């Protein structure tokens, strides 16, 4: 009986120590995690729509990245700086003009509300990308058919 309790206790300790690894365990292989979300930057050059479809196919709940806070913007800029070749001036994010009175859609491609904004310019908005010149912190208008690298979030 004592041996059974000892083994059971040992298994409980192992389980509890592993349960703290959380987010990385559930992220697809090679993806980074932050605050319960998984992120991956891809160097493939695609149009905004193709990149969105690609992200959806990569992971359950995958979309182009939705940047909802300054802290998340900093994390995404870090991921991009580490993984995207610096020869690309723009990197797709999950926001674009949906043709609603020449204003940007009020939601990200994953359906979440736009609660944080960081525009470089406030002109007509088409598709949005992060700009190299701002170290991938500022958003810039980009023609949706342009082929750019992108960041997926799941």
Swiss-Prot record:
Chief site of localization: secreted
UniProt KW Secreted keyword: yes
S-S pairs: 27-38, 55-152, 127-144
UniProt GO cellular component terms: extracellular region
Annotated compartments: Secreted
GO MF, one example: toxin activity
UniProt-listed Gene3D superfamilies: Mannose-Binding Protein A, subunit A
Pfam entry (one): Lectin_C
InterPro entries recorded: C-type_lectin-like, C-type_lectin-like/link_sf, C-type_lectin/snaclec_domain, C-type_lectin_CS, CTDL_fold
Keyword annotations of the record: Blood coagulation cascade inhibiting toxin, Disulfide bond, Hemostasis impairing toxin, Metal-binding, Secreted, Signal, Toxin
Tissue spec. comment: Expressed by the venom gland.
Domain spans labelled C-type lectin: 34-153
Signal peptide coordinates: 1-23
Protein residues bound to Ca(2+): 66, 68, 72, 153
Family: Belongs to the snaclec family.
Function in brief: Inhibits thrombin-induced fibrinogen clotting and factor Xa-induced prothrombin activation. Binds to thrombin and prothrombin exosites.
Quaternary assembly: Heterodimer of subunits A and B; disulfide-linked.
The protein's name: Snaclec salmorin subunit A
Organism, as annotated: Gloydius brevicauda (Korean slamosa snake)
Taxonomic lineage from the root: Eukaryota, Metazoa, Chordata, Craniata, Vertebrata
